Swiss-Prot record:
Descriptive protein name: Uncharacterized protein PA1579
START domain sequence ranges: 1-202
Any one GO MF annotation of this record: lipid binding
Function, in words: May play a role in the interaction of the bacterium with animal cells.
The species this protein was found in: Pseudomonas aeruginosa (strain ATCC 15692 / DSM 22644 / CIP 104116 / JCM 14847 / LMG 12228 / 1C / PRS 101 / PAO1)
A single GO cellular-component term on record: cytoplasm
Length: 202
């Protein structure tokens, strides 16, 4: 079920920037345990975009397999409460995730349309875009209205893969500034650490 892999990215992606804007002027915000996190302001949004980059000592196929494990992937995606595949058609998939928020902030959920492509050098790129009206909203959750991003798995040789995880989003509703500011760092940092740990144990 290789297509299920396309859903792996979404649960950690709840804060960032406007879905139709482009982030630029990336600045290093954190460099910890082999993971670099960059942030960028986005015109028209009060939320920052984030980009995380790390090297994983595993090949692309190993990382793909981890992402295809829908239930298992929720264990290493930051703030993931639930994740499931809604539909798959070839290179396109629609996924649903719930994201944990600290009390008293209302939890978020998000439907993501993921399109996967592979390049000639073996790089896998997963393009992410929110599709908030794909299914009815759930009671007790705030649906994320805008999100764009991507996963990029690029082979570097000798069994090493460079993984980039980038997201821009509008989380909907009201988010305290302290939470928004911490989430844009914690989401890529913890997600990439978790993925790396799982991949390198295989």
């Amino acid at each position: 079920m290789r297509g299920i892999l396309r859903m792996t990215v979404l649960a950690a992606a709840v804060f960032g920037v406007a879905g139709n804007a482009l982030a630029e002027d990336w600045k290093l915000a954190k460099d910890e345990d082999g993971v670099k996190v960059y942030l960028s302001s986005v015109q028209g949004s009060k939320y920052k975009a984030y980009r995380g980059v790390t090297d994983i000592k595993a090949d692309v196929a190993t990382i793909e397999a981890l992402q295809e494990d829908v239930k298992g992937s929720c264990k290493w995606i930051h703030a993931c409460a639930e994740m499931k595949l809604l539909k798959q058609e070839g290179a396109d998939a629609w996924t649903y995730s719930k994201i944990d928020m600290p009390w008293p902030v209302t939890g978020r959920d998000v439907v993501i349309h993921v399109t996967t492509e592979k390049t000639a050098d073996g790089t896998v790129i997963r393009h992410l875009k929110a599709d908030p009206t794909y299914i009815p909203e759930e009671k007790g959750q705030i649906r994320v209205p805008k999100l764009v991003g991507e996963w990029k798995l690029q082979p570097k040789g000798q069994g090493v893969t460079e993984v980039t995880y980038q997201v821009e989003t509008e989380p909907g509703g009201s988010i305290p500034s302290w939470l928004a500011n911490s989430f844009v760092v914690d989401a890529p940092l913890n997600t990439l650490k978790g993925l790396r740990s799982a991949a390198e144990k295989r």
